[in-house]
Amino acid sequence: MLNSASHLLLVIVMCVFAGTSSFAQTAPGKYWVRFTDKNNLPYSISHPEEFLSWKCIGRRDRLGIGFDERDLPVNPDYIAQVLEMGAVSLHHKSKWFNAITIQTEDSLVIEAIRALPIVAEVRSTHSDIITGQSHKWDIESSPSNELRSTRLCDTFPEYGLGWRQIEMLNGQWLHSLGYRGAGIDIAQFDAGWNRTDILPAFERLREEGRIKGVKDFVWNNDSTIYGLNNHGTYVLSIMAAYLPGQLVGTAPEANYYLFRTEDPFSEYPVEEDNWVAAAEYADSLGIDVINSSLGYSLFDDPALNHSYADMDGNTTRCSIAADIAASKGILVVNSAGNSGDDPWRYITAPSDADDILCVGAVNADEEHAWFSSYGPSSDGQVKPTVSAMGQAAAFAALDSSIATGNGTSFSSPVIAGLSACLLQAFPYLSQQAIRDAIVRSASQYESPDDALGYGIPDFVVARELLLTNEPAFGDFEMSAFPNPCNDRLTVTLADAKNCAVAFTVYDAAGRHCADMAGIVLTDGHGVAFLDELVKRLPAGHYTLHAHWELRNSFLSFTKIKQP
């Protein structure tokens, strides 16, 4: 358990940077340095390939998201001027905030940096004050047989103890349709993934090479990712585990990036800087989903503490960054926090961000979990956004058993994983469209409250909402038969009859796979036979884009292997 001054997230401390003014008395540690402008850069938004991956550029192009000044890197000359001031080392760069985080033990250097004409502000983000927050990653375990005796399922036995947390949201039906997150990139922000490199729960993940990258934003020591802390292991297993009959995660076929942003041994605003740096890096890679089972409100140095008034989505750096990430096309999913039974009571940053999914926790009976933080945000937004099972939730333990535990850190990956499955089904849709469908599918959509938000989503309903409203995301309705198909596919596009139509196919990751141009739909019903197109494709899930006369239509289809 955490001490009384702590605010649980997974049963972790949740703290946030206090937006106070620069301190007259500085101390050894880390500092946030924000610059005045981005003048005289050696980069241009007309050449984004110089600082963004092609996957990121492709996603932006596909979703119609442009490039702006925030995408441009920090001026390297400005960074050099700061580092030349004395005993200063660079911790992070933030292009979204036009800032850097530095480390120094010389307070005189900080005053000299403040005086530079290129510097807009300097704030302390870390000092040497420690108040005993070392227990922030404790897990409150409950007996495994709590689920074993009542929640196994004969119809879907592969889920084992994880059955109820998936079934509650109808996630098993997305899986049965073949949507298990394949081709979707999920970045997990956490503290450590102890034994993830050897645990059986992640064997298939490792063998298939779907841990695509790791990065340590705390100590810049990637070799320690698979050690130091267990929290990330437990959270990852809820999404990625594959132990049929014991535990299958919500997105067992997705790709994963493991980013350490949390220092498990202290609590300071620099962890927000780490979060920002990781979010920017995720965007540059073209990541689709961020799961962050983290939150910030109180710090080891009380002078840096946040207030509930700061939980307005527009004050803390990590909350602002979460919204920027969403605007760049990333679906951000964050734990609401575990302060429901504490004096703090409310959600913490970045869960207060406007355009993300803030996830609360319920028990197996779909009742508010006693620890789950309450909303609203201080500016009146409905928070949490949605809720999922986080009390007695099943996860992979370090001894290779399946354990259960409490925390919104466990409900968040349930939602993040199933959201990835929905993105797989609709890869051409924006994160906002996916988020809105999830919210609209929830059990309390018409009457949200401060405990569960809009309620518990139903991912079958979310899929149906997206299918029903598909023409709204293109211009005109298109249907396909058979779907799933093998080497034959016929589409009907009534609005394009007697027109020349160009067809383009994208895979689940949004990559261009094949196209056919100039297909004239002369049939009276606007029918096109795309057998030659689908014959070129391997088995998998695809999006078909039809384009004619400045008009567009989209649909999802699946190609299966020949029997």
Where are the model-predicted features located?
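Subtilisin-like serine protease catalytic core
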Residues: 26, 44-45, 121, 162, ...
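Hydrolase catalytic cores
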Residues: 236-239, 257-263, 346, 390-452
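C-terminal outer-membrane/trafficking sorting elements
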Residues: 473-481, 485-563
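C-terminal subdomain of the subtilisin-like protease fold in secreted/lumenal serine endopeptidases
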Residues: 163, 285-291, 424-479, 483, ...
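Extracellular S/T/G-rich loop segment that most often corresponds to the catalytic His/Ser-adjacent loop
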Residues: 190, 351-424, 428
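Protease zymogen maturation seam
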Residues: 115-185, 197-201, 302
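Inhibitory N-terminal propeptides of secreted protease zymogens
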Residues: 25-144
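Short acidic, glycine-rich surface-loop motifs adjacent to enzyme active sites
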Residues: 280-312, 335
